[in-house]
């Protein structure tokens, strides 16, 4: 009995302790589970927030990309002034020409479109090697710029007049009609209205020369020399001095070209004019030397053969004179000087 009682007591003592230990373990496990659940919820919440932020970022990026493309397409559309000015800054005259054409289809009297179309047409014209294409572009340039003048801002008018004057100047060089008077009109207006461009006096000088006004031409060329000197300008002045009989002044410019110019074509042109001056002065030996030197450098110079013909004519040797003029016509069938001389002596 004692043993049993002792065992029972031991069992009774051990049981509560065991139950207490179990309870503590359960509480610990519950706490751990709750802690794990809390951590899981926090992680889930963080992940959810991250996903939401990422989704918002993706949506924002796509919206930005869409808006950017829309804006870019708008800015660079064929009828956009922004695109027009950007192409102009890049000297892309063909693109400016096309864009302004599209703009004029929608708004035929848009001053901006007319101005840019006129300007781009002009620059395309002067870059052409085909005369017929050049004429077409110049016609467009003139028409657009004249229309633009009617509605242009006051500050833009002198520039339009300057460009219009240049367009008429080039029309005068590529067509059989005379436009030098209109070139002078608009270049003079641009100058009087305060537009500054170093080439205005030279263009005016060439226009006066085309109209047969050598003194006015010399005046403009002299003004041009003060702004910028060039070999082409020097020979243009020399030619005008020759036309008014001031051969001494002409020779000074021609000597400079022969001595200093690196442009072989201008040097040959200067030698030809010197040969003509020497012929007029009856300095036949120097004249012949100039013409023969030209032919050594360019055996196909019709002008040199013509000059030799005139030299022989003045010496009274008409057989040689006719021979030289015929040589000139073989090289250039429409050489006006040779045709005139042979026609004169055929009578």
Task: Tell what function each PLM region has.
Residues 20-148, 152-159:
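N-terminal leader/linker segments that initiate helical-solenoid repeat arrays
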Residues 76-77, 111-112, 155-158, 197-199, ...:
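Helix-start (N-cap) detector for alpha-helical repeat units in TPR-like alpha-solenoids
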Residues 85, 119, 123-126, 166, ...:
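Residue-level recognition of tetratricopeptide repeat
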Residues 123, 170, 210, 243-244, ...:
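Register position in tetratricopeptide repeats
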Residues 166, 236-248, 252-296:
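Alpha-helical adaptor scaffolds
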């Amino acid at each position: 009995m004692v043993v049993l009682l002792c065992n029972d007591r031991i069992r009774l003592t051990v049981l509560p302790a065991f139950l207490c230990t179990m309870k503590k373990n359960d509480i610990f496990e519950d706490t751990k589970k709750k802690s794990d659940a809390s951590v899981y919820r926090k992680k889930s919440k963080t992940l959810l927030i991250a996903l939401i932020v990422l989704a918002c970022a993706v949506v924002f990026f796509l919206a930005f990309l869409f808006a950017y493309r829309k804006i870019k397409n708008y800015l660079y559309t064929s009828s956009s002034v922004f695109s027009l000015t950007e192409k102009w800054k890049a000297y892309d005259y063909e693109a400016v020409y096309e864009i302004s054409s599209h703009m004029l289809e929608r708004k035929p009297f848009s001053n901006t479109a007319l101005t840019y179309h006129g300007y781009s047409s002009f620059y395309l014209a002067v870059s052409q090697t085909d005369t017929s294409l050049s004429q077409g572009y110049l016609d467009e340039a003139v028409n657009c710029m004249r229309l633009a003048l009617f509605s242009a801002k006051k500050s833009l008018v002198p520039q339009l007049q300057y460009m219009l004057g240049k367009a008429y100047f080039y029309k005068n060089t590529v067509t059989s009609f005379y436009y030098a008077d209109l070139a002078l009109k608009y270049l003079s207006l641009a100058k009087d209205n305060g537009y500054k461009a170093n080439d205005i006096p030279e263009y005016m000088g060439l226009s006066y020369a085309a109209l047969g006004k050598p003194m006015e031409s010399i005046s403009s060329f002299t003004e041009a020399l003060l702004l910028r000197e060039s070999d082409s300008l020097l020979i243009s002045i020399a030619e005008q001095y020759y036309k008014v009989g001031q051969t001494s002044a002409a020779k000074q410019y021609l000597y400079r070209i022969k001595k200093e110019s690196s442009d072989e074509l201008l040097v040959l042109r200067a030698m030809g004019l010197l040969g003509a001056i020497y012929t007029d002065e009856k300095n036949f030996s120097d004249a012949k030397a100039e013409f023969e030197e030209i032919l050594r450098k360019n055996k196909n110079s019709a002008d040199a053969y013509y000059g030799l013909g005139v030299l022989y004519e003045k010496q009274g040797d008409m057989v040689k004179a006719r021979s030289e003029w015929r040589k000139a016509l073989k090289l250039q069938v429409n050489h006006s000087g040779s045709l005139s001389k042979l026609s004169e002596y055929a009578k």
